[in-house]
Amino acid sequence: MKQYLDLLDRVLTEGIEKGDRTGTGTISVFGHQMRFNLDEGFPCLTTKKLHLKSIIYELLWFLKGDTNVKYLQDHGVRIWNEWADETGDLGHIYGYQWRSWPTYDGGFIDQISEAVDAIKHNPDSRRIIVSAWNVGDLDHMNLPPCHAFFQFYVANGRLSLQLYQRSADIFLGVPFNIASYALLLQMMAQVTGLQAGDFIHTLGDAHIYLNHLEQVKLQLSREPRPLPQMKINPDVKNIFDFQFKDFELVNYDPHPHIAGKVAV
């Protein structure tokens, strides 16, 4: 994935050292975009091994509208534990906003269902957007959304998705985000009868934490390998019916995992 390695190299070369909320310190650039054509393979990083199980279960968790870590923990996924309260809840984060965005009159909007409907029945719309950045609800989130909103685009029988990510932890978070939204694009394309097109990833504050610099340099020393393919159960026609068993990543041959501490 040259696009990702180019981002790492750019931040190492051009990045400005800044403080941050966690006290760890970063080097960062502001504004970067990567494009992944899913015809060329599934964009799962090969210069270090990713924990695909966590990526899939997290996405299914979002789509369920769930905001409690119990579902994740029941499936051996612990990536949200640091931000959960004593009951396991995370407040009104991604799943809540995607599926139950509150309206002024006491109702709720299921943004995912509305996006599916728009792709099917109004594909030329420029309003097929799902947002997790609810300004009026930020104080009710244990962690405000880093990947803030995404938009769908339909052309020539292909569905593309562009994500805006306000805050991008390049070493740990961004590889997960790329794979997660590429998978969401494939799922949405399948249930709307389209081919998966491009995933475009637009970053705001793109940063490397100072305690990840050596890991990043190690990753840049590794030669990328061919991308794998993601196979999805073709019988699933409803976006909310997918289960973990419906996904198979084939021909994934990554370099070994590189550990890094999460900045909380």
UniProtKB/Swiss-Prot annotation:
Pathway: Pyrimidine metabolism; dTTP biosynthesis. The keyword Nuclease does not apply. Catalyzes the reductive methylation of 2'-deoxyuridine-5'-monophosphate (dUMP) to 2'-deoxythymidine-5'-monophosphate (dTMP) while utilizing 5,10-methylenetetrahydrofolate (mTHF) as the methyl donor and reductant in the reaction, yielding dihydrofolate (DHF) as a by-product. This enzymatic reaction provides an intracellular de novo source of dTMP, an essential precursor for DNA biosynthesis. (6R)-5,10-methylene-5,6,7,8-tetrahydrofolate binds at H51, D169, A263. The active site is at C146. It catalyses: dUMP + (6R)-5,10-methylene-5,6,7,8-tetrahydrofolate = 7,8-dihydrofolate + dTMP. This is Thymidylate synthase. GO terms for molecular function: thymidylate synthase activity. DUMP binds at R21, R126, R127, R166, S167, A168, D169, N177, H207, I208, Y209. HAMAP family: Thymidy_synth_bact. It is found in: Cytoplasm.
